[in-house]
């Protein structure tokens, strides 16, 4: 659908000579938004195909929760500011051994999901045990309907609160990335309201 919409919009801009300058400018702006969404969708689908085919070679290295959160949150700083979402991170020197770029992708998808559903804030915390290092992402949004939780990480599943930019891919991709790095991700509702995602990188085989 996204690709078709982009192509149709492009054709309108090129062929319709009766468009006013204002209408043409509005179409160009909308096309830029559609193109950005299309690029993200194509990249995500390619990554999932690579993971499915087993062609991804992970390169584990030592990092910290603070560094991983910083990398994942950086691209979302402006969108959060535009949405007036307050972002706080309580992550420090908790050690994580992982493929940093892929784990940044996984965490970034979770952060993006929380940002899109938050009412006013997104919070990240981290802790380390002898068995795993855990990063928790929480928001103050509507949370999940009970029937959504079992399907949340299924590919192409879109919940009832899914926005127009939600393709049902990001959470599934995050789970794939974590699973192939000896990790897990789960989601739950917070009793006081909002959603919580728990990502774990284990230090041994699970």
Mark where each language-model region is.
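Conserved micro-motifs of the catalytic ATP-binding
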Residues: 19, 53-58, 91, 95-98
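Short beta-strand/loop element within the Bergerat-fold HATPase_c
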Residues: 121-131
